[in-house]
Amino acid sequence: MSWPSLSGVPNGSSSVSTWLSVTHPRRSLPKELLTAFDTCNVAPEALLVLRSTSLMILEETCVVVGAAEMPTAEDNSGRELFIGSNGDPMERKTRTAHHAIKKTVRIKKGHRTTFAMTVANGAYVKFGARPLTEANVLVVRKWIVKLIADEYKDLRVCDQALVIDRATFLSFIPTMAWNNYKFIFHGKNAVTDRVAGENLFSRIAQWANPGKXGCPVVVTGQGCVISRAPDCAQLRVKRLLGVTKNRTCMRVSGVSPNIQIIPFNNDITTLERAIKERVFFVKNLDKGSPTKFVSPPRPAPGVFAQRLSNTLGLLVPFLPSTAPMSHQQFVDSTPSRKRKVYQQALEDISCHGLNLETDSKVKVFVKYEKTDHTSKADPVPRVISPRDPKYNLALGRYLRPMEERIFKALGKLFGHRTVMKGMDTDVTARVIQEKWNMFNKPVAIGLDASRFDQHVSLEALEFEHSVYLKCVRRMVDKRKLGNILRHQLLNKCYGNTPDGAVSYTIEGTRMSGDMNTSLGNCVLMCMMIHAYGLHKSVNIQLANNGDDCVVFLEQSDLATFSEGLFEWFLEMGFNMAIEEPSYELEHIEFCQCRPVFDGVKYTMCRNPRTAIAKDSVYLKHVDQFVTYSSWLNAVGTGGLALAGGLPIFDAFYTCYKRNSNSHWFSGRKGRLKTLSSVDDSLPWFMRELGLKGKRSSAEPLPASRASFYLAWGVTPCEQLELEKYYKSFKLDTSTLLEEHLWQPRGVFPDED
């Protein structure tokens, strides 16, 4: 889809009344002959009166005529004719037996402008009074087009074209009530009184709260309530009298929405709940049952081999034939932040050898992450479960040579690139747009696999491992790899906290720290969805990033694809739910991002509310303000590389860079140094994609503002106000504020 441009509208118009020329007196207003251009030259006073009386006129005159079949006739030669709106017979060019006579709805002559005013009233209620800018016109016109398509789809095309153009511009004319209140609240006396009151309030607020806006605030981690899940025989919990150390992080005050981001502490109560509710139990979907928690569903024996055999047969010709890397090659290919760990593991293997029985044991702990406590009142903490680095080294040297090639094989299975790992925001959006354009009337649906790792059963792991073994060239290497993978089928786990310890053994399930977690999730999801598409005989495309999936298909196939999906995946051992269908490209949500048009091309854009809230949190305690400035510069640099030129984000990340006071961070080398210096504290997308991003700071274009509104519901006017706020905002990098002295305040327009 390409966004049209608006010509003839001067930039910087404060309101429509300053742009529309008053050329027609009210008494000579030719409503019957108005065109879209003429409507823009109507006196605002006349249109205000027309707006207030349009509903009454519509009701009295019945502007919209009821649908009726077109009258037909035949001429002397036997050709079928239909009677046009002007009463003249016209030939129907194509006519077959299965073509029905089309019904149409028209607007009575002389009332097109009145009907346009009714539509304009709806747009005015939706968007309110706003300046006439190109971005606002694009947003309003898009909304009116959708309204006409949904509510008046049988309206004649010529009437639709006239109504859309007229209603778009009529909706920008403010009502008399708006003008009256604008004078009351923005008159000279009103402004003087309000400024005096605001100054007094500002002085009182500064006296009561000495903390400066924009300074770092210490946020203390918290535990969670005791799990309501039942006790489990496999889980052994030992409580001690130790004192848990609170995790602390830092939040930039005054820049984000009012969303509570608080990490969980690694105490025994929190760890026990995480294990119970993310490993052993799931919530019972039967609301009427007295049992609130049940064991995760498990597939029937042989169901994977039976249902995925055809898909596996189609995939095998595309699978690579690989040989393992050497241990040193694997260490050298590891990201720098983990290279030291694996170099030490290699030295341990060289000295003491590899003991799979002990090295495959899993150490669990509560994940230190930015947890949203606003969208979920009682979120369940997540658990991290890595094995010994020596085990990961032994397995990784087999999997790394085949990983990217398996991703390409899965793309060939669907006929188009499918796995989106490692792609930057521009490439991801381009691939999604290509998939969208493959269908005549496309629809996209997200598939939500609830707690995917927990539902990866023993049968699923065995099937996944069989795919890896088909990629290994030599038989001796197949046996070695099979022996290493076998230790993932029965997991022995333990965890220690200052106030307790846990241990348990579980069959199957995905361990989040395994080398094949990402690859395995992609393999299982892609193959199951492909098999389900074959089962339903529906042509589909898939965008996948592990357990994040979006399926593209024709709208006519949506009902067929959706029916029975939950039951089919439940028999495979997964709780799979279908999210709301997306009929607009901007509504497709993939990995918490949506495609947004930047004026030239589409790019993936994160949710501004949650993204800015999380990007204002630094998962370390600030003991040196040089570190704080480095982090600000790193987030600003990575953010602009991914979202430069997009509404709100460009101003937000520029604000970080401007206030970082790190002038020595410049150029490619400085960028590398900045990101690596605080690498562990950056979001994953900035670590993985920040250096790949090619975007830079730029003023958002009108088409980008309109597309951003479609994606995230922030109007162009709200975008401009937020950007104005960030452009003038000054961060305080010299004062550390305690948490009890700071109250979170939202900066988005729809927040208190």
Swiss-Prot record:
* Reactions catalysed, as given in the entry: RNA(n) + a ribonucleoside 5'-triphosphate = RNA(n+1) + diphosphate
Q: Which GO terms describe its biological process?
A: viral RNA genome replication
Task: Please give the InterPro entries that the UniProt record associates with this protein.
Answer: DNA/RNA_pol_sf, Rev_trsase/Diguanyl_cyclase, RNA-dir_pol_PSvirus, RNA_pol_HCV
Residue span, RdRp catalytic domain: 442-561
Q: Write down the superkingdom of origin.
A: Viruses
Q: What class of enzyme is it?
A: transferase
Show the stretches that span the lipid bilayer. Answer: none
The family classification in the record reads:
Belongs to the tombusviridae RNA polymerase family.
Q: What else is known?
A: Readthrough of the terminator UAG occurs at position 213.
Protein role: RNA-dependent RNA polymerase that plays an essential role in the virus replication.
Q: What is this protein called?
A: RNA-directed RNA polymerase
Q: What is the lineage of its organism?
A: Viruses, Riboviria, Orthornavirae, Kitrinoviricota, Tolucaviricetes
